[in-house]
Amino acid sequence: MEDFVRQCFNPMIVELAEKTMKEYGENPKIETNKFAAICTHMEVCFMYSDFHFINERGESIIIEPGDSNALLKHRFEIIEGRDRNMAWTVVNSICNTTGVGKPRFLPDLYDYKEDRFIKIGVTRREVHIYYLEKANKIKSEETHIHIFSFTGEEMATKADYTLDEESRARIKTRLFTIRQEMASRGLWDSFRQSERGEETIEERFEIKGTMRRLADQSLPPNFSSFDNFRAYVDGFEPNGYIEGKLSQMSREVNARIEPFLKTTPRPLRLPCGPPCFQRSKFLLMDALKLSIEDPSHEGEGIPLYDAVRCMKTFFGWKEPIIVKPHEKGINSNYLLAWKQVLAEIQDFEDEKKIPRVKNMKKTSPLKWALGENMAPEKVDFEDCKDVSDLKQYDGDEPEFRSLASWIQNEFNKACELTDSSWLEIDEIGEDIAPLEHIASMRRNYFTAEVSHCRATEYIMKGVYINTALLNASCAAMDDFQLIPMISKCRTKEGRRKTNLYGFIIKGRSHLRNDTDVVNFVSMEFSLTDPRLELHKWEKYSILEIGDMVLRTAIGQVARPMFLYVRTNGTSKIKMKWGMEMRRCLLQSLQQIESMIEAESSVKEKDMTKEFFENKSETWPIGESPKGVEEGSIGKVCRTLLAKSVFNCLYASPQLEGFSAESRKLLLIVQALRDNLEPGTFDLGGLYESIEECLINDPWVLLNASWFNSFLTHALR
């Protein structure tokens, strides 16, 4: 093949092709088919340009060799064949003088008559497949594409072939001659089969060896090689393909692609019914902490010791009374369970006698609250398979609930700043590479914005509770263990602080599978009067257990202290994820980082410092009925963190389904906003799949409400 190339092509073209291949680290003596392809491509580019000039009236004319053309301007600027730096210099110069947009990839020619760059393609395959590959790669309407094949076919953008028929015929004849010459030497088959998509001199990542074999083995049916599959994917036109498939289907399938217009989407239908209720595993904005500053007592750090010290800071205990009963529960049992906790803690008269772990006596109220002996008896299937009316339990249909205002209030509160710092980030060594320095800077800025955020408190509280509960579930399977709900933070002055939110009593926990459930009773302190929002506390039995004296602007005020009690349950897999709630920090930091990267790529330098320190700039935070809400970069950080934390606290199948399905509609709306003229079919089916997830979950209902606000404002 190398000998053929040197005989068949002009020595100048051969020399340029050799230089080009060496520039990209390729050897013409080894990659002979590529050598031939580059020479062919260059010759076509030169033939395209030959004899074409522009006269003084700006008209394109053809002047044969030998005729005078000294005063005429060449119609085409040849870019192909120049070294890469020079080629880009020529392109930039043309863009500056003509105002034409700069192409993403090096073109082959510039047409001064039509004022456009041209990409020439020469293919040994079908022209339309190669044309689509080029178009998909270039993704620009400003660069004109013209493809020739060795069989005499051609294809060009909008069927505009630029040259007269005679000039194009000359190129096709030359290609046909090259093909015949190769065939007569037995070189054509090898040359034809060697084409792998792009054969021009652009860089290409080549897969070789084991990876190549794996790629060829890992293909859908009907594809013989990875290259065929890639060519198919590159040339894939989704809308046309879908319409084609629909036309082949049964006549019963009645699906037409409809244009998606501003007037097309409707709001999501939120369910009606009683207001939704609080279902998180622990109280959020309504939680009350009993705290000790600078703890230095004996056994400091042992949860039970810390809890006893925190309990001793409060002197307003009183005889508990039920102020809000649970409709279906035996509320007196919850009352007796709290009395039992108080009594067993008060038994530790001398602090030196406090045990490291406290197992509660298995009293009747606790057994009831923890569902002891309530599970139906398991019978071996072999013993009952002949029972004629054997059937599965009828599951109750979930009751539809409407959106309540408390969940928006919870979210707003989670975005707020507290007066304590909840994050202790470990030192991770000195930065060495510049990238590490940027990463540390971003982490430090982000940490400063979110360390005092209430959502961060929820993370640390969730990590502690889930870790303690999982440890107890594995270490004391048969015991009703008392687990204090504790968190640790630092005050504004930097003093350490230990907080007690309440207690958990764990039930029997023989957890074999990840989804096996352990029951627990949570008892949490609060100053929130439940009678203000009774619907929020449907699952709770609430006691008044004391009076707390608070300092206010008008002096000291006594407020009733409540205990929110409920039976709840969790599983190993839920506790495992709860222990990893710190991931929420990482997720929201990555979202912020993508915003910084977008800004940095526009400014062509790292914008981290400017991003966080420009306090005057506001950023979109989310949608509300009023429109797009904006705030400082700190508010954006805290809002993104709160969303991530709530996704964790309110994780459910409803949230999974809503997120996956609503994303599809969101992408369609975004495509419409980007003027991409999206088309849809069975939009009603998509709405159905979104709305079947809107049942009773407060966080999902709030997200659906936000989605409706987005639809309203996005399509104005």
UniProtKB/Swiss-Prot annotation:
Mn(2+) 1 binds at residues 41, 108, 120. A motif (Nuclear localization signal 2 (NLS2)) lies at residues 184-247. Its EC number is 3.1.-.-. Keywords: Cap snatching, Endonuclease, Eukaryotic host gene expression shutoff by virus, Eukaryotic host transcription shutoff by virus, Host cytoplasm, Host gene expression shutoff by virus, Host nucleus, Host-virus interaction, Hydrolase, Inhibition of host RNA polymerase II by virus, Manganese, Metal-binding, Nuclease, Phosphoprotein. Pfam families: Flu_PA (PF00603). InterPro entries: INFV_PA, PA/PA-X, PA/PA-X_sf. It is found in: Host cytoplasm; Host nucleus. Its cofactor is Mn(2+). Belongs to the influenza viruses PA family. Plays an essential role in viral RNA transcription and replication by forming the heterotrimeric polymerase complex together with PB1 and PB2 subunits. The complex transcribes viral mRNAs by using a unique mechanism called cap-snatching. It consists in the hijacking and cleavage of host capped pre-mRNAs. These short capped RNAs are then used as primers for viral mRNAs. The PB2 subunit is responsible for the binding of the 5' cap of cellular pre-mRNAs which are subsequently cleaved after 10-13 nucleotides by the PA subunit that carries the endonuclease activity. Influenza RNA polymerase is composed of three subunits: PB1, PB2 and PA. Interacts (via C-terminus) with PB1 (via N-terminus). This is Polymerase acidic protein.
